[in-house]
């Protein structure tokens, strides 16, 4: 019985030796310690609870809650505090701060900066970290690339089509979420959105066009040429004005020539126009100019003699007999003529009212004219000796 029990004991003693061999040759390199020392060769970087401060761009309270929820799911985190005003995130726990930083940058798509670096590691942990650095030393030995220069603060006016108040609030909310934007001022009447902050216009315009799904145009202020553009315009307009000057003179001359006849009529009109023509020297000049323009214009001469005859006719002591409607047979028209008086100062035609009658004329009645008046030049109906 004793020999049978010794067999299993020998096997149990050989088992630890079998387990030690693979541990020593795991990485293909001999290690100084046993299995327990090899397992404890890579402990976590932060063995104690510590607090780390990260700088993350947080726009609002909702953004801060989202980041806090994301960090709490990370292993070893005990507490998370977010400061929206200062864009700071305080994380407390047994964590690797560098891994958490990379995780946050991957999830939020934003730049995350570790404000307080982790404390220096001493002992076996430092040796393990040194070996890791030695493995990837070529990558970390390269000098860091110089950081791009931060854009200066600027004010950018943009032309965006605005429909209503809800549309304005939506656009304002979208623009404020863009990194680097500080304030947004919107003028709904002019469809102008003014953005202030440390932003690049070349990157902002295509980004807003994609997010808003409408045309976005930057408004560039007009350059001051110190009047150079105006001088060029005046110089270009000067030869055109010279070309137009002679043609305008010809048109005016034609117009004046065509108006000659009208001006002659003004000269040869009735007594009132004659009086006006005799009032001042200026109007006489106009009358004289009308005569000269008659030669140029070639208008038809006005019947001056007929006008004078009518003047004589109006004031003559021997007027012609007027024409009257003939007395009707059907409707009864009565033009009872009591008689005609020919006073020296004028004439009168007494008669009764009007009635409808047939259409015919009474022949002229020859007035009683004295012998000297028949041959007078002032009488338009007088006789003349040939």
From Swiss-Prot:
- Give the observed phenotype of the deletion mutant: Strongly increased bacterial disease susceptibility.
- The entry marks the following residues as binding a metal cation 2, namely 164, 167
Q: Where is the HMA domain?
A: 49-112, 153-220
- Keyword Secreted, does the record have it? no
Q: Which residues carry this modification: Cysteine methyl ester?
A: 383
PTMs?
Efficiently farnesylated in vitro.
Molecular function (Gene Ontology), one example:
copper ion binding
Which parts pass through the membrane?
none
Q: Where is the composition biased (Basic and acidic residues)?
A: 1-16, 130-141, 223-245, 252-297
Q: What induces it?
A: Up-regulated by cadmium.
One Pfam family linked to the record: HMA
Classification via InterPro entries: HIPP01/3/5/6 (IPR044594), HMA_dom (IPR006121), HMA_dom_sf (IPR036163)
**Which chain positions have S-farnesyl cysteine-type lipid attachment?**
383
Give each disulfide bond as a residue pair: none
Give coiled-coil spans as residue ranges: none
* Propeptide cleavage-removed residue intervals: 384-386
* Residue numbers binding a metal cation 1: 60, 63
Region of interest called Disordered, as start-end residue ranges on this chain: 1-40, 129-153, 223-301
| Key words, A-Z | Lipoprotein, Metal-binding, Methylation, Prenylation, Repeat
Say what the protein does: Heavy-metal-binding protein. Involved in disease resistance.
Give the family from UniProt.
Belongs to the HIPP family.
Q: By its UniProt entry, which PANTHER family does this protein fall under? A: HEAVY METAL-ASSOCIATED ISOPRENYLATED PLANT PROTEIN 5, HEAVY METAL-ASSOCIATED ISOPRENYLATED PLANT PROTEIN 6
- Protein name in UniProt: Heavy metal-associated isoprenylated plant protein 5
Q: Which organism is it from?
A: Arabidopsis thaliana
